[in-house]
Amino acid sequence: MDIFSFFSADFWQANSLCFMFISAFLSATVLPGNSEVIFVALAVPKLMLGSLFNVDILALILIATAGNSLGSLTTYGIGRWMPKFDPKNYRTLWAINQLRRYGAIALLLSWLPVVGDLFCAIAGWLRLNFVTSSLFIFLGKMVRYVALLFLSTPFLL
């Protein structure tokens, strides 16, 4: 494989789900990933070919959700390693209070920019149950990508 095949359209098309996973994973961490842009760019051509829920669309949703969820669980794991401290930042105090009040169900909002990453890290720091935290993170991320899919369909009509 030569270096120029990396720039070909065939290479990107053949590996689109892999790139979606990587972008979704990075988007859920503090690194930039632009998963929404890539998701819509991959979903729109598939939507133009057929129905709203075909195998390609479902695979795209599952891959994006899995990558984004694993990125958030990485942030959760980093939160578990953080030593106990007395937070003084208003945003951190607010997130801690919300997670103490609502528990792991608050992680349904883990898809939100900035606050979602903070929720995941604090959930790990508070030692919330890993299985229930994973479930709510996964559900929140999936709802986000399904909503993004429905928001992008009016532009096809």
Swiss-Prot record:
<comment type="similarity">
    <text>To E.coli YqaA.</text>
</comment>
<feature type="transmembrane region" description="Helical">
    <location>
        <begin position="47"/>
        <end position="67"/>
    </location>
</feature>
<keyword id="KW-0472">Membrane</keyword>
<dbReference type="InterPro" id="IPR051311">
    <property type="entry name" value="DedA_domain"/>
</dbReference>
<feature type="transmembrane region" description="Helical">
    <location>
        <begin position="3"/>
        <end position="23"/>
    </location>
</feature>
<dbReference type="GO" id="GO:0005886">
    <property type="term" value="C:plasma membrane"/>
</dbReference>
<keyword id="KW-0812">Transmembrane</keyword>
<dbReference type="InterPro" id="IPR032816">
    <property type="entry name" value="VTT_dom"/>
</dbReference>
<dbReference type="Pfam" id="PF09335">
    <property type="entry name" value="VTT_dom"/>
</dbReference>
<keyword id="KW-1133">Transmembrane helix</keyword>
<protein>
    <recommendedName>
        <fullName>Uncharacterized protein HI_0489</fullName>
    </recommendedName>
</protein>
<feature type="transmembrane region" description="Helical">
    <location>
        <begin position="24"/>
        <end position="44"/>
    </location>
</feature>
<feature type="transmembrane region" description="Helical">
    <location>
        <begin position="105"/>
        <end position="125"/>
    </location>
</feature>
<keyword id="KW-1003">Cell membrane</keyword>
